């Protein structure tokens, strides 16, 4: 399975961004494909524009690993210039998706990231699912953004 882009990442579906000091919740749908992800695949989520800070984020995932010993794990962060890997990792070793659940930022790496330039945010699959069960399921990433 190759890496995928969300509709927000590709500009097909708008990503809401704040135009003032209020915090705006911006939702990014994650449509899981029929084919299983393998290690190092990327789910390119969205671009946070320059001048906008991410104050918090959550990722809500369905159960995408139905194996008796689930293995699915991922990281989240900013893509490198080529869009081929994470250059800045906000969090790693995340296992949400082994069972349905919510992952919420547990450190401030996303908040401390420079807002001087656009940041392309992605999830990187670090361990493939033991038994992939994501086909046709949808998750969501919610970025709380502030201008």
Feature map (PLM): residue ranges:
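Surface-exposed, low-hydrophobicity beta-strand/loop segments enriched in small/polar/acidic residues
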Residues: 2-147
